[in-house]
């Protein structure tokens, strides 16, 4: 009887998000499937249990071959150049289909068309995973945010972003020109999105809050390209002990300005600094 095996735990997803170029969850899905297709063909592994546990492990592959960033294109190039089974692998691997399935699971039939202009083909699910997402921000702390100019630079599309802002009850006070989405064609870690917001706010200083390597690199790129600016980078580590340790290990030696367990702690710290009460 086949044994059910989880091929990607939280640690693997974190590994991908920490290398840069894979900030997009849908591309991570495609990268995971591509890795296991490569491993299955390269090492003639048939059983799912062995596929996960026999070397090379996915974390070792990431650390050995993908640390330069560039995400999925880098992975595709490496397999094409180094695998004797590349042609067979890429006949099986359908990136567009994989991403659509992931989008359908996330948005469900309820939002798939509105968010992604797709008619669901593979997943028969009215309510997607987006309906299970909880709001991490304490609503009482919104008053702190509104003391500042607030902009959003996100990898989500405009319709999906507006859904989230509506859920937060932010649409009534954040103007559309303060939101840069994937519809603009700008993707992190390009500094262009932040620079557009900086120009619109006429600001030389700012703080960008994220949780991935691409978020950190976006700020780094902005400060390198525009010497007159000084943006700080803040990374939210979450309350998982492994994730907190990993993000501290990776980001602090690179000059991260703020590492916080959650966005609420970060906002309270900002408020204390503003009022002169910071330790």
Map each language-model feature to its residues.
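Short amphipathic alpha-helix with an adjacent loop that forms part of the alpha/beta core around
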Residues: 266-276
